[in-house]
Amino acid sequence: LQIIAGDLTLDSHREAILQWVDSQWGGIDVLVNNAGIGAIGRFDEATQDRLRQVMEVDFFAPVELTRLCLPWLRKGNRAAILNVGSVLAHRAVPNKSEYCAAKFAIRGWSESLRVELAKEGIDVLMLSPSTTRSEFFDSLVDTNPQEKSRSVGSMSSDRVAQLAVSALVRSKREMILSVGGRALVWAGRLFPRLTDRLLSRFA
């Protein structure tokens, strides 16, 4: 295992990482887009920078990294792109509007890219975990510390990683990982007005 630190929002850092990967392994079979940040708080109380930061890291960075990786993936063995989204890519909730917007964007882009690359044999998969126990909440943008302390993950990062490997092995186009997540998504689809009313209690 080798780790390279870098800012994926910068073109130069993305290119440097790809050059290093090419020098070490000469190609890419699987790209996992998992870098992300979030924010908690009402939209009307947030700064413009909060939305831009979240979108840069959670949407534009993985999109542009994927663009750079495509030449290698086209030559890869059972090539796949795994985009780590969220349950909130399927059903938005209050006080996380920027994060929901970024994850909805990732999901839409993934669906389009999946069809575009299908004939080339490159799988595009979408993994949608619920809240995960990780250092994610240590880097929330423009968020009240009290909100951070209330953010408790329901699934370990190790378990999410295991399910990600399973999705890759099975070429599972989309996985919502938790029972609670699937319940929220289906409630939003079947009973949208009721779901809105229930969620508004947390706004």
What feature does the model see in each segment?
Residues 42-43, 47-52:
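Substrate-binding pocket helix/loop in short-chain dehydrogenase/reductase
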Residues 66, 102:
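Active-site helix of classical SDR
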Residues 86:
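Residue(s) in the substrate-gating loop at a strand-loop-helix junction
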